[in-house]
Every structure is written in C-alpha cells, then in structure tokens.
C-alpha cells in the first residue's frame, strides 16, 4: 500500500501541469463535456425511443443536473463557467482577464464537441436504425436535434433571437446573484446545485421555442460534430441558417444581463468592510486554489 501511494504521488507530480491557464482550460473542457454528454444523452434517449423513455421534463432535469455535475468537477480549478456567455460576463465585469475569453471558449467548444461524440458513439446503432440508416436534420425522423438546437416551425428569426437573448440574460442575472458575496450568497458548496436549478427553470419555462441553448459552446461544438459525422452542411442551413443565433444572441444577452443586475442590484448593495477573520478565509481559499 505504501509503495502504491508513493507511485501514485510520483505520477501525479510528473503529470501536474504548472501553467495555470492550461489547467483551467482542461477543467473547462471536461466540465463542458460532462454537461453535453449527460444533457444531449437525455435528448437522444427521448428522441430515439420516440418518447417512450422520457420527455420534456426529463431532458430539462438532465441538463440541470449535468450543469451541477460539470460545476462540481471543474469549479475549484477554473470557476466552471462551461459557457462562453458566462466567461464573457465575467471578463466584462473585470472579474477575469480578457485572455481567458478565447481560451475558455475554445476549451468549452472542444469539450462540447467531444461530449457530442460520446453520445453519438453511445447511441450509434440506435441513430442509424431510427431512420433506416439515414441521417436527417429535421422532420419526424430528424436526429441532428439530439446534439444542437433548431427553431420550432412557428419561430421566425427575430423571435428566435429574442428568445436566446432573454434566456441568456436571465441566466447571467441569476448567476451574478448567486456568486455575489453581498447579496444573500448561497452557502458555500451549494453554488453548483443552485446554478443547476437555474438552468432547470430556464428550460422548463423557455425551452419550447428552440431548446434554450443559451450557450454558444454547447450549441456550436455539437453542431460542428454533426456536420462532420454525416449530417453535412444542412446543420448550418436548416431553420434559415439558424446556427449563428445561439452564438451571437447569448453573447449580447450576457451583456444585457450584466447591465440589468449591476444597475438594479449590484451597484446598490452595501459592502461592509471585511473582518480579519473573513479576510483570512478569503486568502486561505485563494492560496488553496493557486496550489491546484
């Protein structure tokens, strides 16, 4: 047992990445992979069973808990943004350096791409069997919607853009409230569960129009995977070239969410001077994070 522990310790030292930003990028990649793997996996189960193994509620529950698990996995290393819109908001508020925006976004998109690949491999036979060995983007036998979001038939581009804008703004307002230490902060350790609950609420109230992507990486990574896996360029042209809406609109919604929270709540909160005990706790926490 002693030799085994020593061997494990040595392996850990050899594999330890000293470049902190790279460690954070890897954490974002894995956290987003978990989010997409469980979230899109639930969609696959519902679609491929034609509704006999779940429904709208199970999909929303899966995405909510998937976000929670992703945050629990990556939170201590990177903050677990798992979403370029969240990273953009944090950079906009000067809580993160701007260099993290492209790096986190790339890592999150890669994680989403890999998560989609896992779901595709897991349900490979079922996907091909679903439409007699054909891959359709939309329609009664469409399977591309397992991985990325597409607008419902009733939705036009303007309404769809507004849908993603409001959904993301709501997400950012709630996230900022959850992490704000001066606004009834969530008990330490429960942030992940609370953010997962926010995603669940957004899904159950705003998911009808287009599936509430509210996350450019979660949508574009799997969409790119489907384009390469056999669905082709139709994943970008379907829905009046819908693909750009879940990228642009959430970023604009992120800015709106920041302004709404700061103008109506954040700028008006009293910030009492921290006691020595509180300051020590913060410093200890920062020191611990730096050693990861």
Swiss-Prot record:
Widely expressed in epithelial cells of kidney (collecting ducts) and airways, in keratinocytes, immature dendritic cells and erythrocytes. Isoform 2 is not detectable in erythrocytes at the protein level. A motif (NPA 1) lies at residues 83-85. Residues 43-56, 122-159, 207-210, 225-242 are extracellular. Induction: Up-regulated by magnesium. The record marks 63, 212, 218 as: Selectivity filter. One of its GO terms (cellular component) is cytoplasm. A motif (NPA 2) lies at residues 215-217. PROSITE patterns: MIP (PS00221). The keyword tRNA processing does not apply. GO terms for biological process: cellular response to hypoxia; establishment of localization in cell; glycerol transmembrane transport; odontogenesis; positive regulation of immune system process; regulation of keratinocyte differentiation; renal water absorption; renal water homeostasis. It catalyses: glycerol(in) = glycerol(out); H2O(in) = H2O(out); H2O2(out) = H2O2(in); urea(in) = urea(out). Residues 1-24, 75-78, 93-100, 178-189, 265-292 are cytoplasmic. Keywords: Blood group antigen, Cell membrane, Glycoprotein, Membrane, Repeat, Transmembrane, Transmembrane helix, Transport. It comes from the Eukaryota. InterPro entries: Aquaporin-like, Aquaporin_3, MIP, MIP/Aquaporin, MIP_CS. One of its GO terms (molecular function) is water channel activity. Residues 79-92, 211-224 dip into the membrane without crossing it. The keyword Cell membrane applies. It is a multi-pass membrane protein. Aquaglyceroporins form homotetrameric transmembrane channels, with each monomer independently mediating glycerol and water transport across the plasma membrane along their osmotic gradient. Could also be permeable to urea. Also participates in cell permeability to H2O2 and H2O2-mediated signaling. In skin, transports glycerol to the epidermis and stratum corneum, where it maintains hydration, elasticity, and supports lipid biosynthesis for barrier repair. In kidney, contributes to the reabsorption of water, helping the body maintain proper fluid balance. Aquaporins contain two tandem repeats each containing three membrane-spanning domains and a pore-forming loop with the signature motif Asn-Pro-Ala (NPA). This is Aquaporin-3. It comes from Homo sapiens (Human). The lineage of its organism: Eukaryota, Metazoa, Chordata, Craniata, Vertebrata.
